A protein has these predicted regions:
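Long, contiguous, secondary-structure-rich segments that constitute the structural scaffold
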Residues: 555-607, 699-701, 705-716, 720-807
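Long, well-ordered, tryptophan-enriched scaffold segments
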Residues: 262-366
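N-terminal export/assembly segments and adjacent metallocofactor-ligating motifs
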Residues: 2-298, 324, 343, 465, ...
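Short beta-alpha connecting loops at secondary-structure transitions
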Residues: 271-277, 537-548
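A glycine-rich phosphate-binding loop feature that marks nucleotide/adenosyl-phosphate handling sites
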Residues: 306-309, 363, 406-417, 575-590, ...
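Extended redox/cofactor-interaction regions of prokaryotic respiratory oxidoreductases
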Residues: 2-3, 174-259, 266, 284, ...
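Active-site phosphate/pyrophosphate-binding segments
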Residues: 322-441
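Phosphate/diphosphate-binding loops
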Residues: 496-497, 544-563
Length: 807
């Protein structure tokens, strides 16, 4: 390819081969003044200048990070995405750079499949048959049905479905329908979350809260032990945790041990040791480590005596049975008579006894040790017990409330105190678990406090009749047992109205009766708070990048219009006379009151972000309690760490539980259902666990082509299990159990334990739900259960048994 003029250069078709051949020309061009950049003579005088601008915004999906985005706009379209370019990017004041998901956000904004107009369902729920309607018809239909259901059934018949598609927003948050319902008498609310149901419940009984040291405190530790914790995929960006783990370990040179069924991306050469473990057996490992710590006199006895209840006989509550304390349980002197030795745990976990002993000695001798757990181990049928058992290792070694230690839960972060859009008080005090909403639709009047975890009263009076589904794929895709959920939603005499508000025709959107097109947070103004941000808090003032397209509207406008139709009092209570812009200015002003050094509103529109470091350098959970337990008691009945919980002992005695549902007053190991030793393994021999895939945040970004190509949806299977089934890497396989089946590509890899398989959660369901119901999209919930865990009544979505066959 010969090029002699600048015009020819501008018009030439360049391939990689031709570029390599002409590399000498390229070097000459850069060295010569004959070719100057830009080629300004190519601009035609008749062309009008194109208006360009750049605004600050944020990615607000539910990864736990809230990354700064610089959106470059031309012709009212985002064409280029930068991230944080502010400041000097030094440790402690680093740039909040987005991951590849956030950097691909223009592909979401400009996606051809975005919802454009209000629609109403004209086919069966799940068929995806809709017709376009006007905004007035949509809002009138919603308001009329809501008014009717409130009159006929009462406020407990209305529920706001769990959703996290815009979880990081403030006035664009998934929970904004709360405020509308609280403006007109309240609604049946929920407790817990799909992320942390089991661990949040368990830690409330143990510590009175679920809180951990910030990850930057790893700079002060000697050892990092991660149970099922994978921030390199779940919180990989500058607004997340991976940066802190890397930087802090460079300063402490701490040894890092990763315990996970998969060799995950957080390990990936960073770890000093990977211990693969059977899913759901982390509690057995923790108990065996405790056995070594106790028998080798490596526990912090003064800490246990001063700060804890129930470690041994002298701190056991007076009403507890003799030998009901933790030490007796571990040594085999309790009711079960089983010593929790490394040999005992090796048969359960698949980790050799000598490795367990080595790990225990490392934990016992490292002063301090940063022991943490992700949210994967607790997302099992025995998750409440597992999370307590792991946290006990921090308690036994006295690592709670100190620098370089941790409480044994997932890492925490410091909060600078962003003012949140107030949701108002809910007059309805009845609650259900976040995971039991399908039961509340199907047989709500039968749900009780002692069997189903109903709170606020002994039983539900009415089933759910009206469902708000905002930025939520939980309606079908993200909820356990898709086939069961499909059946429940088919009968529209049960839940009479489902209102969906979304950006795309997701699997869940197909089940809505009225479907409204939402503007994305990047198309609106909002005040965005950090979340998993270590010891550096920050707040982002997001500005709309583009004008509204088609008939998309902001959530605040939609709900204001519904409130207006419900009456002037409801409208006034919901809006307080403020527009969305006025609310943002109000929230900014309240945040600035707590942080006087924060720029004023107009200046922050230019700067985009305000960063502030924790005044104590590192955030330490329960520091005040450790320093003075009398003045700063925990929020437990005793004010101390409750190793033995009298409240849990009472619940275990009074709740209706099945034989394989165990609630224990101690952090004891319990197998759970659908686990490694379930008799069902004779039919379905492989354990299946989910994981948070870097290509998506749950199901958000699940329809972005470049991310799908970079990270294909596959089932992980060990070469030993694959060979036994004649499966090769890339083969299409059938994964199935009693709940459902899917066809998916096999990823044959030694990065997963034999006997265990894994599928990244959040892939969009692609199944003919009125035909064979075989999923071709890789949605793990076609295989999971809708049976809740014993205590939290949470989602046990990692406890699954399957078989895999080559197609």
């Amino acid at each position: 390819m010969k090029i002699h003029t600048t015009e020819a250069l501008m018009k030439a078709e360049i391939s990689r081969r031709s570029l390599m051949k002409t590399s000498a020309l390229g070097s000459l061009a850069l060295a010569s003044s004959a070719f100057t950049l830009p080629f300004s003579q190519m601009v035609r005088a008749a062309e009008a200048p194109v208006e360009e601008k750049a605004v600050w915004s944020s990615c607000t999906v539910n990864c736990g990070s809230r990354c700064l985005l610089r959106l470059h706009v031309k012709d009212d379209t985002v064409y280029w995405v930068e991230s944080d370019t502010t400041g000097d990017d030094v440790y402690g004041n680093h740039q909040v750079r987005a991951c590849l998901r956030g950097r691909s956000i223009r592909r979401r904004m400009n996606h051809p499949d975005r919802l454009k107009y209000p629609m109403k369902r004209v086919g069966k729920r799940g068929e995806g048959k809709f017709e376009r309607i006007s905004w007035d018809e949509a809002l009138d239909t919603i308001s009329d049905n809501l008014r009717r259901i409130l009159k006929d059934y009462g406020n407990e018949a209305v529920h706001v479905l769990y959703g996290t598609g815009v979880d990081g927003g403030n006035i664009t948050n998934s929970n904004v329908p709360y405020r509308l319902m609280n403006s007109c008498g309240g609604f049946l609310s929920r407790y817990g979350s799909y992320s942390t149901a089991q661990i949040s419940a368990a830690m409330s009984y143990m510590f009175g809260a679920n809180d951990g040291n910030s990850p930057d405190d790893i700079a002060n530790t000697k050892l990092v032990v991660m149970f099922g914790n994978n921030p390199a995929e779940t919180r990989m960006s500058g607004g997340g945790v991976t940066y802190y783990v890397e930087q802090a370990r460079e300063r402490s040179n701490a040894r890092m041990i990763v315990i996970d069924p998969r060799y995950n991306d957080t390990a990936a050469g960073r770890e000093d040791e990977w211990l693969p473990i059977r899913p759901g057996t982390d509690g057995a490992l923790a108990c065996a480590i405790a056995w070594v710590l106790i028998t080798e006199n490596m526990v912090d006895q003064p800490f246990l005596d001063k700060y804890c209840v129930g470690y041994d006989e002298k701190t056991l509550p007076a009403n507890a049975p003799r030998n009901a304390h933790y030490k007796a349980y571990i040594l085999g002197e309790g009711p079960d008579g089983i010593a929790k030795t490394p040999e005992w745990a090796a048969k359960i976990t698949s980790i050799p006894a000598e490795k367990i002993i080595q790990l225990a000695r490392e934990i016992g001798s490292a002063k301090p040790a940063y022991i943490c757990q992700g949210w994967g181990p607790q997302r099992h049928s025995n998750g409440e017990q597992t999370s307590r058992a792991i946290a006990m290792l921090s308690v036994l070694t006295g690592n709670v409330g100190i620098n370089g230690g941790n409480s044994g839960v997932r890492e925490g972060s410091w909060d600078l105190g962003v003012e949140w859009f107030p949701m108002l008080e809910n007059p309805v005090k009845t609650q259900i678990s976040v995971f039991t909403w399908t039961d509340a639709i199907d047989h709500g009047k039968e749900m009780t406090a002692t069997r189903d975890g109903v709170r606020g009263k002994e039983k539900l009076d009415v089933p759910i009749k009206f469902l708000w589904c905002y930025a939520s794929n939980t309606l079908i895709n993200q909820h356990g047992d898709i086939n069961h959920t499909h059946e429940v939603l088919q009968d529209d005499s049960k839940c009479e109205m489902i209102v969906g508000i979304d950006h795309f025709m997701t699997a869940s959107a197909k089940y809505c009766d009225i479907l409204l097109p939402d503007q994305m947070p990047t198309e609106q103004e909002d005040l965005i708070s950090h979340e998993s941000a270590g010891n550096m808090g920050y707040v982002i003032l997001a500005q709309p990048a583009t004008s509204a397209k088609f008939e998309r509207k902001p959530i605040y406008w939609m709900l204001s219009e519904v409130a207006k139709r419900l009456g002037p009092d409801v409208y006034q209570t919901f809006t307080e006379g403020r527009s969305q812009h006025e609310w943002i200015k109000y929230l900014h002003a309240k945040t600035k009151e707590r942080n006087p050094e924060m720029p004023d509103y107009e200046e922050m529109k230019t700067t985009g972000i305000f960063k502030k470091k924790c005044p104590e350098e590192h955030y330490v959970a329960f520091r005040a309690f450790r320093e003075d337990p009398q003045a700063n008691p925990l929020k437990t009945p005793s004010g101390k760490i409750e190793i033995y919980s009298e409240r849990l002992a009472k619940i275990a005695d009074t709740w209706e539980l099945k034989k394989d549902e165990i609630i224990h007053p101690l952090p004891a190991y319990t197998p759970g259902f659908d686990g490694w030793d379930d008799p069902l393994r004779k039919t379905y021999p492989l354990q299946l666990t989910g994981f948070h895939y870097k290509a998506r945040t749950h199901s958000s970004y699940g329809n972005i082509d470049v991310l799908q190509q970079a990270c294909p949806q596959e089932v992980w299977i060990n070469p030993i299990d694959a060979q036994a089934r004649g499966i090769r890497h890339g083969d299409t396989v059938r994964v199935f159990n009693n709940n459902g089946e899917m066809l998916i590509a096999a990823k044959v890899t030694p990065r997963i334990l034999p006997g265990v398989t894994a599928i990244g959660q959040g892939a969009w369901l692609k199944a003919d739900m009125f035909g064979d119901r075989v999923d071709h999209g890789g949605s793990i919930n076609i295989l999971t259960s809708h049976r809740p865990s014993p205590l939290a009544k949470g989602n046990p979505s990692h406890s699954n048994l399957v078989q895999i066959e080559k197609v």
